[in-house]
A protein has these predicted regions:
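N-terminal secretory signal peptides that target proteins for export/translocation
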Residues: 1-6
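Bacterial N-terminal signal peptides
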Residues: 12-21
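Glycoside hydrolase catalytic-domain context in secreted enzymes
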Residues: 25-701, 707, 712-724
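Short beta-strand elements
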Residues: 725-735
Length: 735
């Protein structure tokens, strides 16, 4: 979503508007509650049937009102219907005389965004990238259900979360909002999130369609990519997410793809999304991402946000003049109506309630514990032993006050005044306090970490030194490099030189380089951990929770190893020019299919930590591998089985990963993720696991036949604990 500067309304204006709100809202509610004969309120009818029935009763103006927003705080001057908004990202007028409610929208990447300015506070979950490290569809469902519930509690019935752009560009400032670099993992997790969001009777959203893989020049950039490459990478994540979650809306992105802006790109919106995938919901523009009226409507854009520059009076005039057929406008409006019925917002009107703060915090902490990745544990320095630990040095990262969060439209404000759109915000969840509570008898030292020499002196005094290091990222900007900011690499080097038992806890929105990795004993990746992150980290440091998370992205050794070693930027004179008629610079994604680990595999580049990597306080073994093709009736279905055993002394949960190497004739990267299983095991316990591999996950996009196909030949299947730790393998021929 676009950069939003949340402005304050002058007190006099606010009072005047408030006096207008009460009678207007009363009238609106009275109209909405009037119940003449409305056959479309029969819930036994399908959403399509109900939408068609309503559409036949609507006037031209009512149809136009459904296909654009009515504004949001801080975006232009107040509009005539501004008082009907809920203070969120925007809203769409309903049709009160027909019982169709308004759509009240809020950003909700990792919690309900539009809260603090209205005196409401939301649960801040760990970032989406963090939750992806759980590799757990059930955790994704829990995540979505909480957001859906809190949206309704605060008066919203549509979420603007559901980001699933792949980590094609690791320096992307919004990677923390997304689900990692693999389309099957990302699509599966976002689909489960959306499914459980919508189960709470809100309209789910998946975004940013498509290839909005960096923030730099996002309004001006044209992405150049082959049909096959985008179908098998970025678009596949959307396709899987839509097939699982059935979102009511797809948000088109700011950038252009192969020459046309995404929100007026017929190939993306109609040919692929609506035709090939059969998407029945509506396409909503990213905020300010609409560029035209006739072209955008013909391409398949259904709803302009947050205002009506192109889909208000201009669209009405185009319909009346015949430039836009009435049938086209009807399709836009029908899709909005269908999503309202399918999501249940018509039959289950929003009723505001007090947010269950304690319940939300418990969910946030649970997901944070499942999402924190143990990257290094030399000499089993972790978990820390309470009995022998007499002193601890806590250094850096504002660990005395909180843990950092991601910025932009995703930002969930903690209690207190609302923050600027791009601001460093620390949730008041203090690692220092959480760790002190674990060992109340130990001596605690704290140093802010602003001076490496001073921090080193503090570290010398303690049995163990824990450095909290952060990398703040935000919508609207990318990080210039993957190194830690604010001289933190030097800080860690100094502390590690002073204390041989140095542990680093990372709070980051994407991968970071670690020039100090050989000099520290332990590393935890906590990501943006939400408003109970400190408790989760403390539980893992002291072994109350056994880490089980694994990386959903690759951590490279350096920026030089990336497909694009230097971030592609627009020329300075072409930056931030607002809505354009055409893009002004290109990014050629010539790495094509080789996104994330597939790039490093294909190019034989060593990495710092591979995709799928994550340590535990216990150990696991894999054995008895078997792979078999399906029956004669379904020969492309493959079943993989193996035995997983917990060979350590602690209970734990292992994420077992299955990869496939396709025949050389397929022209694919060396291997791809095709399945996984998360299994909880007691010490010494074994379990036989069997995974059925979806043939779609073994397919390639064939441009000649315009479809997916399984290439005949020999397939190698591999199983293990990460993309570079695959002790089991077997082959099978597919025809």
């Amino acid at each position: 979503m676009s950069g939003r500067s949340w402005t304050r309304v002058m007190l006099g204006t606010a009072v005047a508007l408030f006096l207008l709100v009460l009678p207007a809202l009363a009238q609106h509610n009275q109209l909405e509650n009037t119940a003449p004969n409305r056959p479309w309120m029969n819930t036994s009818l399908s959403p399509d049937q109900r939408a068609d029935m309503v559409l036949k009763q609507m006037t031209l103006d009512e149809k136009i009102n459904l296909v654009h927003g009515e504004g949001m705080p801080g975006w232009g001057p107040p509009r005539p219907n501004w008082y009907l908004g809920n203070g969120g990202a925007g809203f769409v007028l309903g049709v009160p005389r027909l019982g169709i409610p308004m759509i009240q929208m809020s950003d909700a990447a990792y919690g309900v965004r539009a809260s603090a300015q209205n005196g409401r506070y939301s649960t801040a979950l760990p970032s989406n990238l963090a939750s992806a490290a759980s590799w757990d569809p059930n955790a994704a469902c829990e995540y979505g259900a909480l957001i859906g519930t809190e949206l309704r509690d605060q008066g919203y019935n549509m979420t603007l979360g559901g980001g699933v752009n792949l980590t094609r560009e690791p320096r992307n400032g919004r990677n923390f909002e997304y689900m990692g670099e693999d389309p099957i993992l990302a699509g599966t997790l976002v689909g489960n999130r959306i499914m459980c969001e919508q189960a709470q009777h809100v309209i789910g959203d998946i975004k940013h369609y498509a290839l909005n893989d960096q923030e730099s020049g996002r309004n001006e950039v044209n992405v150049i990519i082959s049909e096959r490459a985008m179908r098998e990478t970025d678009l596949l994540a959307f396709q899987i997410g839509i097939s699982i979650g059935h979102p009511g809306a797809v948000m088109c992105s700011y950038n252009a793809v192969n020459g046309d802006f995404a929100c007026e790109n017929k190939h993306l919106l109609t040919d692929i999304l609506k035709h090939d995938w059969g998407f029945p919901g509506f396409v909503v523009s990213d905020w300010g991402g609409t560029h035209s009226t006739v072209k955008a409507s013909a391409a398949g854009l259904d709803n302009e946000e947050p205002l009506d520059e192109f889909f208000g009076a201009k669209l009405k005039e185009a319909v009346q003049s015949g430039q836009v057929p009435m049938s086209q406008l009807d399709d836009h409006a029908r899709r909005v109506l269908r999503s309202e019925f399918a999501s249940g917002i018509v039959d289950h009107p929003v009723e505001k309630a007090v947010v269950d703060v304690e319940g939300g915090f418990a969910t946030s902490q649970d997901i944070a514990e499942q999402s924190t990745v143990l990257l290094k544990n030399a000499g089993n320095v972790l978990p820390l032993d309470r009995a022998t630990l007499h002193s601890i040095a806590i250094i850096g990262g504002h660990a005395d006050s909180g843990m950092i969060s991601g910025g932009g439209s995703a930002q969930v404000d903690p209690p207190g005044p609302p923050h600027e759109w791009q601001a460093h915000v620390w949730f008041p969840t203090s690692p220092l306090k959480a760790i002190t509570a674990k060992v109340p008898g130990a001596v605690m030292y704290f140093d802010r970490g602003t001076d490496p020499a001073s921090a080193a002196e503090v570290a010398k005094k303690a049995d163990v030194a824990i450095v909290f290091a952060y990398q703040w990222t935000s919508e609207g900007m990318d990080v210039p490099a993957l190194s830690l900011p604010d001289n933190q690499d030097a800080l860690i080097e100094a502390v590690a030189a002073a204390n041989p038992k140095t542990i680093v806890v990372l709070e980051t929105g994407t991968a970071v380089t670690m020039p100090w990795i050989d000099n520290v004993r332990g590393v935890l990746e906590a990501w943006f951990a939400g408003n109970k992150g400190a408790s989760a980290v403390a539980n893992i440091l002291f072994g109350d929770v056994n880490p089980s998370a694994k990386l959903p992205i690759t951590f490279p050794r350096s920026d030089a190893d990336l497909p694009h070693p230097t971030l592609v930027m627009p020329p300075p004179e072409q930056r931030d020019r607002g809505v354009l008629t055409r893009p002004t610079f290109n990014i050629n994604y010539d790495e094509g299919l080789k996104v994330g680990y597939k790039w490093y595999d294909a190019e034989n580049k060593p990495v710092l930590f591979p995709f799928g990597f994550g340590l535990s306080y216990t150990t696991y073994s894999y054995s008895d591998f078997n792979v078999s093709a399906g029956s004669p009736d379904n020969p492309e279905v493959v079943t993989v089985s193996f035995v997983l055993k917990n060979t350590g002394s602690r209970a734990g949960a292992e994420i077992s990963e299955v990869y496939a190497a396709l025949p050389a004739s397929a022209g694919e990267p060396p291997k791809r993720l095709v399945g996984w299983s998360k299994t909880a095991l007691k010490p010494g316990e074994s379990r036989s696991l069997s995974l059925t591999i979806d043939p779609k996950f073994l397919s390639i996009w064939d441009e000649g036949s315009h479809g997916w196909k399984v290439v005949p030949g020999r397939y190698t299947f591999m199983a293990g604990g990460s993309s570079q730790d695959l002790p089991l393998s077997g082959k099978v021929d597919l025809q």
